[in-house]
Amino acid sequence: MSEKKYTFETEVDKLLHLVIHSLYSNREIFLRELVSNSSDAIEKLRYESISNAALNEDDTDYAIRIDFDKDAKTITVSDNGIGMTEEEVIENLGTIAKSGTKKFLESLTGDKSKDNELIGQFGVGFYSSFIVADKVTVRTRKAGQDKSQATKWVSDAQNGFTVEIITKEKRGTEVILHIKKEHLDLLEYHVLKGLVNKYSDCINTPIQMKKVEYDKDGKQTVKDEYETVNNTKAIWLRSKGEVTNEEYQEFYKYISHDFADALMWIHNKVEGNLEYNSLLYIPQNKPFDFWNRDKDYGLSLYVRRVFIMENKELLPPYLRFVKGVIDSADLPLNVSREILQHNKVIDKIKKAITTKILSELKKLASKDKEKYQKFWDSFGQVLKEGVSDDYSNKEKIAGLLRFATTQSGDSKQTVSLADYISRMKESQDTIYYITSDSYKAAANNPQLEAFKKKGIEVILMTDRIDEWMMSTLTEFDDKHMKSIIKGDIDLDKFETPENKEKFEKEAKDFEKVLKEIKEVLKDKVEDVRLSKRLTDSPSCVVVNDYGMSLHMQKMMEEAGQSFMPGMGMKPILELNAEHNLVQKLKNEADTEIFADLSELLLLQAMFVEGAKIEDPMAFVKLVNKYIR
């Protein structure tokens, strides 16, 4: 059959350009990526052949082979895995099905060091071949297909690609790289074997190369016999003492396609009623598309060394940053995703590894604060999801949380709840916090004034998830958690008798004027009262103990979400009796000015709180009216 010519989709063209021009300094990854693809193809066949043995075509000696030809200037990576059909070749090698590709391309900065890191997080897979090759040929046949229905794919990365139907005796795929002249040094046995040992030594499948012998003068002879050049015992099945730190890190890079080292790993073997091996990694940095809800996540599930699938059910969503492998002896080889969703063994493994991860994070936080801080900066926001999502581990997760506070001095989240409790005032039995949409807005919120004056530390929460999290986290270590922007604040135990008496007198003096202000504001407020929070500012707004904060109401409205009954309620206006503006209001006889000042005190408090101002122009006009 004659060859057919195709053009790459636009995003592939862009990615190829990036690979060729940005990753030249990381050329070694091409072999890791091709070996990884071959390993995946073999694992797929191994799994498919459980239910259809004919796919093996009487060949169960699964292997990946690496050959090089100095005369032809080629490197060939071949496997006897599942192979591809013509349609799969066009789909897999001509387009990028990976979600978030466009966002990834838009996120590139032009800074090569930063872009290299982003490209590494994205994973370029097969296209890394063009780092070292000016032409790539792929010959492949799907297991079970007729020998005459194989497919040949050819591209120089410049002018699209061609596809034609060919005859191929053996199933599987071979990728032939026509090496660029500046990379001809790769055409050496010791170079290629070194790359295998560096990047792919621990994969499950044998990687084979032709034997090389050297005579007494150092001249090499390549034999026709193949030998295995990698350690085929799965790294997760080896004892910890057998695995070096370098091997752990290279296996992480192999499964994650990350350029950076893992932050930490957890290697565990469980025996008894439930038997499994696990090797789990926590990355240093979150990938560029970490918040993409459509992105798949999960550990690789093996059953007795046979790869089954990537499985989300092995981890709760708030631990989706964890990479790694679970190998169980207690599951059937023909297990399906549907069966896994209702499998008691999977449920037990999930519970056990979740507990293990949280335990190891607690140890890390205790032993290496700097490394834990790096983890928190990358994944703290997603860990917070667990407070609401995982009731059984809520207290453990809460102990891992970190925050900025009024005493920490900047926006960096470094203070644990245990740290806060250790610094509480002698008679304090409540953990105070404030939620806001930015650090500066929280740190300068007028509702902190009384707390600062009395030396009471307040936690500053500024992540979007915080208020949702705190609706579940109502106490920690037997201490009540209290938002300072909700409900009444009782600081009487920190007050002198003189100040208590003074406040009671002011409340009585303002009783009439507070009623008048409430009448003026009518449907805009739930109540008007004197504040125990304010010392310098004239006014603030709060909601009741069970209401949703005003900035949260604003975020939900902007997202087009409706409120549950009672959540989107009117604010409570609090006034500082000692402020000049409030004193002026108290003594104001002109009804128009009284109404304007009442409105102004409410609107400026709403503005400071980040609440939605229904008519911003009316607010501006009101301010301008009284600027002298």
From Swiss-Prot:
Keyword match Cytoplasm: yes
Positions of the UniProt region annotated as B: 338-554
CDD domains (alphabetical): HATPase_Hsp90-like
Location (main, coarse): cytoplasm
Stretches for region C: 555-628
Gene Ontology MF terms: ATP binding; ATP hydrolysis activity; ATP-dependent protein folding chaperone; unfolded protein binding
Record-level GO cellular component terms: cytoplasm
Keywords associated with the record: ATP-binding, Chaperone, Cytoplasm, Nucleotide-binding, Stress response
Subcellular location(s) of the protein: Cytoplasm
Coiled coil regions, renumbered to chain: none
Pfam (any one): HSP90
Keyword flag Ribosomal protein: no
Region of interest (A), residue spans: 1-337
InterPro entries membership: HATPase_C_sf, Heat_shock_protein_90_CS, HSP90_C, Hsp90_fam, Hsp90_N, Ribosomal_Su5_D2-typ_SF
Recorded family membership: Belongs to the heat shock protein 90 family.
Subunit structure: Homodimer.
Purpose: Molecular chaperone. Has ATPase activity.
The protein's name: Chaperone protein HtpG
